[in-house]
């Protein structure tokens, strides 16, 4: 069974990811690139291949009432993909209205699947 460790603590959490985890889950904060660099250093210390660790993120999907935030969401996801993230999971704002899900299915998911 694969092991995923979530969190961004530099001394303990990311060290444990480098040592034991098959995947990690990080928040898409402005510090995420730095946290990935810390993880790389821990991997070097433990002689672990950094690229073997799957990088995932928690993400808040607020597409807007009419999809006005789609472009911004897609660009953020593209940036995370370029950093090595393979999956984004999270909640869709106002999901009970169904329209946000339709927008996600029509615009966000196909765009993200292309990178």
Which residue ranges define each predicted feature?
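Active-site-adjacent structural elements that line small-molecule/cofactor binding pockets in enzymes
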Residues: 1-115
